[in-house]
Amino acid sequence: MVMGVAMHELGVLNQVVKTVGRIAEQNSIVSIRHITLQVGTVSGFVPRYLTKLFPVAADSCPALQKTKLRIEMVEGRGLTIKEIGY
């Protein structure tokens, strides 16, 4: 794993965890089963790194301790939270 690339993914995952954690808290959700991210094919994000690093980012949020990360590749450059399953 190239550290610079991995840090890029970790930073984005930290934002995803922060956002989903806030949504869970606002809605009194104690456990999130899965998060589906749509990742653009030319976004520069490496799905394998996102998957490997997700548990590291999720460790900071109790509601995400057992969450499975799902990744859907789509056309484009972005990364979007498509679905939060609870």
Task: Give, region by region, the residue ranges found by the protein language model.
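Charge-rich, low-complexity N-terminal segments
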Residues: M1-Y86
